Swiss-Prot record:
Positions contributing to Mg(2+) binding: D13, G40
One of the GO biological process terms: IMP metabolic process
Positions that bind substrate: T298, N299, T300, G301, R302, R303, R304
EC number from the UniProt entry: 6.3.4.4
Keyword Hydrolase: no
Names of required cofactors: Mg(2+)
Keywords of this entry: Cytoplasm, GTP-binding, Ligase, Magnesium, Metal-binding, Nucleotide-binding, Purine biosynthesis
Similarity field: Belongs to the adenylosuccinate synthetase family.
Protein name from the UniProt record: Adenylosuccinate synthetase 2
Organism lineage: Eukaryota, Fungi, Dikarya, Basidiomycota, Agaricomycotina
Length: 426
């Protein structure tokens, strides 16, 4: 009677989807607990030639016909985007409408949130980049936090139109009256509500009944720990809880039901947009990681910033999330590097910091102390067992395990779904 959770341990884009793909074959329910369409996933559909991007629908339920998808209470949902996604999947032969449920407590994202997001950026002069990829997430969570937002169950309330107008007027007062068809949007959502109605459930009752009935539940946490609203590099973060705590609050389950939290770790470090990045490499190494690793955003197409693996960040992430095991991804991207560095200490004026600092001004002053490990200078893409990995590759993994005190259970050695090695954990 437990839940398996897959969480990003860095700044996102660690490649959680592949592990979730593998684990989904043996579960009954796959869930999202927080975030929205700012978290992109690319899946290869087994029918049809196109890759599809699925920010909302748990992609594992799409690829496992015996699995049910659940969008939890902590998610903010833009219904037109959700239905557009479902229609695109149906066109590829993956009709999951009857296997996808959404919490009646989930908050709604509207088109005016996009407009407000843009107005906020203009107001700030582009000086403060928040991570939400212009997907309207910040203003939607702002409405939620100010207790003025609308939830899924409000769609079926006779007072929906009145509440919607009041919500829009509130933003008009904040930013001035921008161009927006309020009445047209109300009519559109009346239609969308009827399509949504069969999917709406009480998430708390549903998931507790499922767990008590012995159903196997898999959850992918939103984004990653370093983008968490409380524990990330604030204000360069998203607007929700991306830690293991967000799983509990987003689905309505107690901590004791989480049986196995798994941390996904890219073999190097990347991040999108602005914000501190202590191990960033603005040199040939960074360019190599970016180009060989094809580090471009799923949603935005923007280049990701790249750098060495930061074990200070990972230690911090392990402390907060309590990972049982780790999945290292994209290890093959390091194949051709003669030596590999990992950040092991943050120093300020020669003194080691005891943890990851909250103060970004202090973080900007850190000097990173690196450990240098030998590379393996050979391709591992075709390796099919952990024992067959080059010695220096195994030593790299062992160094990470020893530093963090958490075993590595899965190792990604290539882009394909089958390019994942399973390592025995004792």
């Amino acid at each position: 009677m437990s839940v398996t959770v897959v969480l990003g341990s860095q700044w996102g884009d660690e490649g959680k989807g592949k592990l979730v793909d593998i684990l989904s074959a043996e579960v009954d329910i796959c869930a999202h607990c927080a975030g929205g369409s700012n978290a992109g996933h690319t899946i290869v559909v087994p029918v049809g030639p196109e890759d599809l991007r699925v920010p909302f629908a748990p992609q594992w339920c799409l690829l496992n016909p015996a699995c049910t998808g659940l969008i939890g209470s902590g998610v903010v949902v833009h219904l037109p985007s959700l239905f557009s996604e479902l229609d695109a999947l149906a066109a590829q032969g993956l009709d999951c409408t009857n296997r996808l449920f959404i919490s009646d407590r989930a908050h709604l994202v509207f088109d005016f949130h996009r407009i407000v997001d843009g107005l906020k950026e203009v107001e700030l002069g582009g000086s403060w980049y928040h991570w939400d990829n212009q997907k309207w997430i910040g203003p939607a969570y702002s409405s939620k936090a100010s207790r003025s937002g609308l939830r899924v169950h409000h769609l079926f309330d006779d007072t929906f139109a009145e509440k919607f107008r009041k919500l829009v007027e509130g933003w008009f007062k904040r930013y001035g009256k921008f161009e927006y068809d309020t009445e047209g949007e109300i009519l559109r959502y009346k239609v969308l509500a009827e399509r949504l109605r069969p999917c709406v459930i009480d998430c708390v009752v549903y998931i507790h009944h499922a767990i008590s009935s012995g159903k196997r539940v898999l959850v992918e946490g939103a984004n990653a720990l370093m983008l968490d609203l409380d524990f990330g590099t604030y204000p360069f973060v998203t607007s929700s809880s991306t830690s293991v705590g967000g799983v509990c609050t987003g689905l309505g389950i107690p901590p004791k039901m989480i049986g196995k939290p798994i941390g996904v770790v890219k073999a190097y470090t990347t991040r999108v947009g602005g914000g501190p990045f202590p191990t960033e490499q603005l040199n040939d190494v960074g360019t190599h990681l970016q180009e060989v690793g094809r580090e471009f955003g799923t949603n935005t197409g923007r280049r990701r910033r790249c750098g060495w693996l930061d074990l200070v960040v990972l230690k911090y992430s392990c402390m907060i999330n309590g990972f049982d095991t780790l999945n290292i991804t994209k290890l093959d991207i390091l194949d051709k590097l003669p030596e590999i560095k990992v950040g092991v200490k943050y120093l300020v004026d020669g003194k080691e910091l005891s943890g990851f600092p909250a103060d970004l001004d202090l973080l900007a002053k850190v000097d990173v102390e690196y450990a240098t490990l030998p590379g393996w200078n050979t391709s591992i893409v075709d390796v099919t067992s952990c024992d067959a990995l080059p010695e220096n590759c195994r030593k790299y993994i062992e160094y990470i395990e020893t530093f963090l005190g958490v075993p590595v259970e899965w190792i990604g050695v290539g882009p394909g779904r089958n390019s994942m090695l399973i390592k025995e954990v004792t």
